[in-house]
Amino acid sequence: MIKIRRGLDLPITGEPRQSIEDGPSIRSVAVIGFDYHGMKPTMAVQEGDKVKKGQLLFTDKKTEGVRYTAPASGTVSAVNRGYQRVLQSVVIDVEGGEAETFAKYSESDLANLARQQVVDNLNDAGLWAAIRTRPFSKAPALDAVPAAIFVSAMDTNPLAADPTLIINERPQSFINGLVVLSKLTEGKLFVCHAEGASVPQSSVATYETFGGVHPAGNVGTHMHFLAPVSLERQSWSVGYQDVMAIGDLFTSGELASERVVALGGPQMENPRLVRTLVGASLEELTAGQLKAGENRMISGSVFGGRNAYGPTAFLGRYHNQVSVLAEGRERPFMHFVVPGSKRFSALPIYISTLMKGKKYDFTTSCNGSERAMVPTGSYEQVMPLDILATQLLRSLIVGDTEMAQKLGCLELDEEDLALCSFVCSGKYEYGPILRDNLTRIEKEG
């Protein structure tokens, strides 16, 4: 077992009850453009078109041939675009149950599939986009071959669901998905899980155990310790629920768009796990469930999720949780001189440090304005990777991409720097800064 000792488990209230319930009926779903880094769509539909589940919505001009499909049948009600016509979302009003059909195989035939059969079927159904590369966290080229593939069957994010609870609802789907994915690489297929977790076993996969504090469950952490990446050595990652969807696709011939999502946070009345659709409207999913006041809906983790509002108020493609926090617009007078029994800090500056096990009603407040980056050692306390955290973050801030590559930025995704953003006394958001640098590296080298 690989034990992660440097990191942080956030003591936040609103932890969801670990039992799965049916969610409310969803009337609209969406494919969010921002979920796919650098993607430039060629649209195949327009507002008013009727679509089936699994029908093509658009392809990517940059990664030629990669298809993005509808998660549900219905009518395209909106194609939302932002600045410079960047695609924000394609919204579908759900109606009917029509679905496209794809190649279908018996479970015994999955082990004999050719690689091209797997690639074609995944791409036809839109599940090729469920795979993400590292570096760059994008959908891979259709002819790319990874050094390794990672499936994370654990989640240490605050307020997350227990993946084994979800996987063991349909264990054979998970195993079938692993068999299919094993055809895409000549290297290892890693399944990473928590200590003592009951994960369905398959001979095609290598199982690794991780323990300790967050980010022990991040796929970037797993790659760093098991198969580090570089520009010449690419690895892929696939979410555990997408592995199950892949298994179902190949045995049923139909796109599976069900997703189990954790609803949690201090402002959630009834934190729990619900069964819903990929891309579900978060307003409909949380209707009647929010506490009074001004709230912020987050698709994903409180550390690395996306503010979901307006045309993007839908469940993200790679998200398994929805978090709700109160908007922290208040500015307490001289909060830095109070004992702080009701406040949390990663540094031992409040008396709450002595109150082990206490949980807090976090808000969106940053507790201060932006200022210069100060190296206090807090970054190193939450960075478990073998990386010089302060030096890397400085390189990213000034845009020194050559030094950032030497210091290991190619191994990272936004979620890997989320804890650095949380503990930063300068209030920097390192995720977007990292993405800007990765985009430059991809373009310029």
Curated annotation (Swiss-Prot):
It catalyses: a ubiquinone + n Na(+)(in) + NADH + H(+) = a ubiquinol + n Na(+)(out) + NAD(+). Its EC number is 7.2.1.1. It comes from the Bacteria. One of its GO terms (biological process) is sodium ion transport. It is an enzyme of class 7 (translocase). One of its GO terms (molecular function) is oxidoreductase activity, acting on NAD(P)H, quinone or similar compound as acceptor. Composed of six subunits; NqrA, NqrB, NqrC, NqrD, NqrE and NqrF. NQR complex catalyzes the reduction of ubiquinone-1 to ubiquinol by two successive reactions, coupled with the transport of Na(+) ions from the cytoplasm to the periplasm. NqrA to NqrE are probably involved in the second step, the conversion of ubisemiquinone to ubiquinol. NCBIfam families: nqrA, PRK05352.1-2. Belongs to the NqrA family. This is Na(+)-translocating NADH-quinone reductase subunit A. It comes from Teredinibacter turnerae (strain ATCC 39867 / T7901).
